[in-house]
Amino acid sequence: MTGDMLSQGKVLVVEDLHKSFGSLEVIKGVSFDMDFKERLVLMGPSGSGKSTLVRCINWIEPPSAGRVTFDGKLVESRKYDIRRLREDIGMVFQQFNVFPHLTALQNIALGPIVVKKVDRKAAEAEAMELLAKVGLSHRADHKPGQMSGGEQQRVAIARALAMHPKLMLFDEPTSSIDVELIHEVLDVMVKLADEGMTMIVVTHEIGFAKEVADRVIFMDQGLIIESGSPCEVFEHPQQERTQSFLSKVLLA
């Protein structure tokens, strides 16, 4: 199965993935695959396993069972270079995961300098380009405490992009941002999608999903309940659990 999928250009193959914390099984046998440049949105109620799933993909949470194959290589903690995996898979978290004592420019340049041994001037030059990309050139010398939540999250996105990832994971990137500022982050993500970035996005932003997603996966209780195009999942959901969830989200 894995070999056939990879021969068709799959960047990610997840097979029968399980994750338990003690006696609590959070992911209960999830399987899916992704093409290069595909945009995948994960949706579902709180506690459905969405965030745990993306954290298993880049080995922040090692799976309890199952297989993750990324870019043609089976990911195993003892055989695969996990640090290299995290260079190739960028992640943006719910909270603004930026260093409070560093400026926006320093936050973005740090990874390439420390991990990839890029020359400081070159790293800072690219950091300025990335700040422009996310609309924050004027914030280069500002520290996180001097920026809004939306600005901090855009710095976090730029910092992940500085490592030139092959896949970007977004774990509810707008959940901690004031409603009035959510569009700042979503606009950047739409731009990345338009440029062909391969993305997995955990979100409840249905408008974003309709605009960007090639495919939507709906999860509940650690399982994939439904999967399809945005039109199929949002306009013609087949499962009662999906219908119930969407009716509540759309009324919120």
Question: Residues of each region from the PLM?
Answer:
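Pre-NBD coupling/linker segments of ABC/ABC-like ATPases
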Residues: 1-6, 242
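ABC family nucleotide-binding domain
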Residues: 7-14, 18-230
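C-terminal boundary and immediately downstream tail of ABC-type ATPase nucleotide-binding domains
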Residues: 231-252
